[in-house]
Amino acid sequence: MCCLFGIYDYGHSLTAAQKKRLVSSLAIASEDRGTDATGIAYNHNGHLTVYKRPYPAHLMRFKLPDDAACIMGHTRMTTQGDGKHNYNNHPFEGTAVIPFALAHNGVLYNDLTLRKDKNLPPTRIETDSYVAVQLLACLLYTSPSPRD
């Protein structure tokens, strides 16, 4: 299964280097739960940034801005959707009134039924988890907007 991790710099007391070190350490510690891909999401200057790669966490290189107070991350063990295709990796981007990022740990066994029953739009994203992004977007009358 996968792993979720993150930090919240509530007092804005950490430097970008300290946050990077913390997030990197958490990601590497999370490799026991998945090495097929690693990704992070954070807000920078009012814009959602998602960075993900089909690498284990110990090979992932990233930068964090000083103003990123909340950073979420995900290490993936592939269960559905080839992890070599980065669009299948977490976190996923969507829009439901405002842009959001979603990462999921687990397996949705009814994703194909949900796609059909809720008449969700076709997507090249093959994971079961992405149906949650689509459902959130449809619930609030917007559509997901994945970026690779």
Each PLM stretch: what is its role?
Residues 1-143, 147:
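Conserved short alpha-helical segments that host acidic/polar catalytic motifs at enzyme active sites
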